[in-house]
């Protein structure tokens, strides 16, 4: 897709023209077509619930499962749909029986609720939670692999890490990390919250046991889209967080790993079914996937790179700011993060960006100091990044 077409693509997004949106890493806006699709499904659900749920949903659900599986290089028969990464990871964490004494290994920069999740597992099972330090501004993915491998040992029962680190946008070498863990008999759980739509994701090349992803960020799918992709043979280890109608498959459902009449498989549906609820976001996911396919995923990634390079050039020459995201395309994508000067109040800065300048950007306390993360996507403009730079100067007195 030519650069000149990005303005047209921006016009196809639901964007508030008064807001500079630099926070796709927390939640992406919807393409208008995806909004119309999910709204249409909800209108049918509201008007005639049983017709929609019993007669329309099964085919739509299987279509969504297949579409998402193709995008991520997965198997639809091993792809459980979920609300988000948090739900998917907690499903795994609440199900696995890890041998004690032993250890759960994490990187030192994981999403806080996920760290809490594994801390709870460690307490319940009598395990130790250990972290390894991610290299600062690595120039080669092998540096990350070496740091993780050095922390693995005979007591390591499970290794959890983010494919893309939320704080900095650092991309971890997921395939290599999972290969090293598997060679040592260590179960792997990967937090892929940022990966769908952000990376050229191919789960067939990542030998992980459990891979969780979200759709409401870079995939630009409706809020409420997540997934859990399972390695062969791991489904039987999982128990649903809620017992509902799919807990015992109805007579004639067929094998646990075969497509059923509900748009799932008996094994997957057991994990997915939470009673009557709104799964319209799942059903609308193909629209978001098709939208980005039309623009060209490679072109989108290249455009993000142009925008983050512009942000790097613009923000580099400011005293007190420390770059936290590597420059290598192997290690970074559409996000770039900076450590802000000591004494900066993260909450006040974020409030000032929004209230004075209508800029949405992630600013958070992250010891040893606050971090600003810029998430640029194809609908971002260079002028918007210029506005951020000017706003930062105004708010920090530079």
From Swiss-Prot:
Pathway: Antibiotic biosynthesis; cephalosporin C biosynthesis. Keywords: Antibiotic biosynthesis, Isomerase, Pyridoxal phosphate. The modification N6-(pyridoxal phosphate)lysine is found at residue 217. GO terms for molecular function: isopenicillin-N epimerase activity. Its cofactor is pyridoxal 5'-phosphate. GO terms for biological process: antibiotic biosynthetic process. The keyword Electron transport does not apply. SUPFAM superfamilies: PLP-dependent transferases (SSF53383). It catalyses: isopenicillin N = penicillin N. The keyword Isomerase applies. Gene3D superfamilies: Aspartate Aminotransferase, domain 1, Type I PLP-dependent aspartate aminotransferase-like (Major domain). Its EC number is 5.1.1.17. Belongs to the class-V pyridoxal-phosphate-dependent aminotransferase family. Catalyzes the reversible isomerization between isopenicillin N and penicillin N. This is Isopenicillin N epimerase. It comes from Streptomyces clavuligerus.
């Amino acid at each position: 897709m030519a650069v000149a077409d990005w303005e047209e693509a921006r016009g196809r997004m639901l964007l508030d023209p008064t807001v500079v949106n630099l926070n796709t890493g927390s939640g992406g806006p919807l393409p208008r077509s995806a909004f119309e699709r999910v709204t249409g499904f909800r209108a049918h659900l509201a008007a005639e619930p049983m017709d929609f749920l019993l007669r329309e949903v099964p085919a739509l659900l299987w279509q969504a499962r297949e579409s998402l599986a193709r995008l991520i290089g997965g198997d639809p028969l091993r792809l459980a749909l979920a609300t988000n990464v948090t739900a998917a990871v907690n499903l795994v964490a609440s199900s696995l029986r890890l041998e004690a004494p032993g250890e759960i290994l994490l990187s030192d920069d994981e999403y806080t609720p996920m760290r809490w999740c594994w801390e709870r597992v460690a307490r319940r099972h009598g395990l130790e939670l250990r972290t390894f330090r991610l290299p600062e501004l690595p120039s080669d993915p092998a540096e990350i692999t070496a740091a993780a491998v050095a922390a693995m040992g005979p007591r390591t029962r499970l290794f959890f890490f983010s494919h893309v680190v939320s704080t900095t946008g650092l991309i971890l070498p997921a395939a290599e990390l999972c290969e090293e863990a598997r060679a040592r008999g260590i179960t792997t759980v990967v937090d892929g919250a940022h990966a769908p739509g952000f990376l050229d994701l191919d789960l067939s090349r990542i030998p992980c046991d459990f891979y969780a992803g979200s759709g409401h960020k870079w995939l630009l799918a409706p809020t409420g889209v997540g997934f859990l992709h399972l390695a062969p043979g791991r489904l039987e280890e999982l128990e649903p967080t809620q017992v509902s109608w799919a807990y015992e498959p109805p007579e004639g459902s067929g094998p646990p790993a075969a497509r059923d009449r509900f748009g799932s498989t008996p094994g997957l549906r057991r994990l997915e079914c939470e009673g009557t609820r709104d799964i319209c976001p799942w059903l609308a996911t193909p629209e978001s996937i098709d939208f980005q396919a039309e623009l060209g995923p490679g072109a989108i990634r290249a455009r993000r790179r142009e925008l983050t390079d512009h942000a790097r050039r613009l923000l580099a020459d400011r005293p007190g700011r420390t770059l936290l995201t590597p420059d290598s395309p192997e290690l970074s994508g559409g996000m770039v993060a900076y450590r802000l000067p000591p004494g900066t109040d993260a909450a006040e800065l974020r409030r000032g960006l929004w209230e004075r300048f209508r800029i949405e950007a992630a600013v958070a306390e992250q010891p040893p100091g606050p971090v600003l993360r810029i998430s640029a996507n194809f609908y971002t403009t260079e002028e918007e990044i210029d506005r951020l730079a000017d706003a930062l100067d105004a708010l920090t007195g530079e």
